[in-house]
């Protein structure tokens, strides 16, 4: 379920420097990192269904073990309304990806073979103080920003045109998406 696919390319930097190997990877939906992201995303969606202004900072950790798989949910949530059943949301997200058999490391549908630990509390007052503002000026709390860069490496390929993305990353992501489609469609 969780394969890693890499694309490598030799680059010759300007200025006469020696060549360097540029590598990029993309993982499929069953990879532990993607599984954790999918579970956390499902929890965010469940909270936003209850309260469209909910603030959710939940981390997920998974571990397949011989005797029993493990999903750990930890974080803070602030919402007005009924608290979602975090365990059920996590189990369903893992099952949707395909973790439904103990033979592959985790059967998220069966509590006998998969333990879910929930350590989610109300958002701390210190973080809430930084984000509880009215109108347009709202703080970011403890959340960070990710960044990348745009380039023209994909512009000479019609099917990738307009992405302005590093070619190695675009190809590895495309391969991962196709493998996921093939797995899901059988």
PLM regions and their residue ranges:
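Short, charge-patterned binding micro-sites
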Residues: 58-80
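Short N-terminal amphipathic alpha-helices
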Residues: 48-62, 84-87, 102-105
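Glycine-rich, mobile lid/loop segments that gate access to catalytic sites or pores
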Residues: 23-27, 62-70, 95-186
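N-terminal low-complexity, intrinsically disordered segments
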Residues: 31-34, 86-87, 126-128
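N-terminal, positively charged regions that mediate nucleic acid binding
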Residues: 10, 14-57
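Short, small-residue-biased leader/transition segments that mark boundaries at the very start
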Residues: 1-5
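Active-site-surrounding "flap" and adjacent substrate/cofactor-binding loops of secreted or lumenal enzymes
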Residues: 77-98
């Amino acid at each position: 379920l969780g394969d890693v696919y890499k694309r490598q390319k030799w680059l010759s930097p300007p200025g006469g420097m020696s060549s360097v190997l540029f590598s990029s990877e993309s993982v499929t939906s069953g990879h532990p990192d993607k599984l954790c992201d999918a579970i956390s995303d499902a929890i965010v969606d469940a909270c936003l269904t209850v309260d469209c202004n909910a603030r959710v900072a939940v981390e997920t950790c998974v571990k397949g073990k011989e005797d029993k798989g493990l999903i750990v949910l930890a974080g803070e949530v602030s919402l007005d309304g009924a608290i979602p059943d975090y365990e059920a949301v996590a189990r369903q997200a893992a099952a949707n990806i395909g973790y439904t058999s103990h033979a592959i490391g985790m059967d998220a549908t069966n509590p006998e073979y998969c333990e879910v630990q929930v350590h989610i509390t109300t958002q701390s007052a210190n973080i809430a103080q930084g984000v509880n503002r009215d109108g347009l000026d709202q703080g970011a709390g403890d959340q960070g920003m990710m960044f990348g860069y745009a380039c023209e490496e994909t512009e000479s390929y019609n099917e990738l045109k307009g992405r302005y993305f590093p070619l190695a990353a675009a190809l590895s992501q495309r391969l991962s998406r196709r493998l996921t489609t093939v797995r899901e469609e059988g």
